[in-house]
């Protein structure tokens, strides 16, 4: 999974934007290896 500060989804390749637990993910059913997650604030310990 690629983690970047801004995610870009390409619907023509089957990408879908999903928000889970306050984070933005790009998932793809056609190409399951094509995943992205938007980097949020660092985790508190």
From Swiss-Prot:
One of its GO terms (cellular component) is ribosome. InterPro entries: Ribosomal_bL36 (IPR000473), Ribosomal_bL36_sp (IPR035977). Keywords: Ribonucleoprotein, Ribosomal protein. The keyword Transmembrane does not apply. GO terms for molecular function: structural constituent of ribosome. Residues 1-45 are annotated as: Disordered. The keyword Lipid metabolism does not apply. One of its GO terms (biological process) is translation. It comes from the Bacteria. Belongs to the bacterial ribosomal protein bL36 family. HAMAP family: Ribosomal_bL36. This is Large ribosomal subunit protein bL36. It comes from Chlamydia pneumoniae (Chlamydophila pneumoniae). The gene is rpmJ.
